[in-house]
């Protein structure tokens, strides 16, 4: 989906990774968020006349298209699920605020470490980590576009994190040997992910 397109359905990522981005006419791109399995792209986007950003895939993805009728029925008959959708909207806004802080105030090393922590926590919340490891299909170009750094700077920063034994990158797998140390390096506080609101409080079956 590209900027200027007329939105119709809401996309739910069932598998794979995607991103939201803005792009200038000369091709320069700013990634403003990553979508992981279980994420909804632009809740209630169908109320807008046109897209003001683009959504691109990072890996092969499987999506479910959720219609306006679906959301109307959920809102009317399943208040717990409706609350969960509101929770996701608020968490997405909190993530966006944290990304703004990342771009404006953190150093290069802190930016990368913080982003890696966020992705690891989000994947763990979705049950997609394996001990200290998780899938990590992002390229250095993706990281550069998400953190406002050059690819050269990203490469150097990743080397620094590796040499400090904060991360291990093996192909498309990220290993975090000591999450607490990586959190400290990125000045990361997971409170903005509001993970305490996951679980039974939002269980539609209760």
Language model regions located:
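Polybasic "coupling" helices that flank or enter modular domains
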Residues: 59, 79-148
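Conserved short histidine dyad/triad with adjacent acidic residue
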Residues: 1-5, 24, 35-37
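ATP/adenylate-binding site constellation spanning eukaryotic-like Ser/Thr protein kinases
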Residues: 15, 37, 60, 68, ...
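Cyclic-nucleotide recognition modules
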Residues: 33-98
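Cytochrome P450 core scaffold surrounding the K-helix E-X-X-R motif
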Residues: 20-27
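Phosphate-/nucleic-acid-contacting segments
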Residues: 121-206
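Regulatory nucleotide-sensing modules
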Residues: 1-11, 15
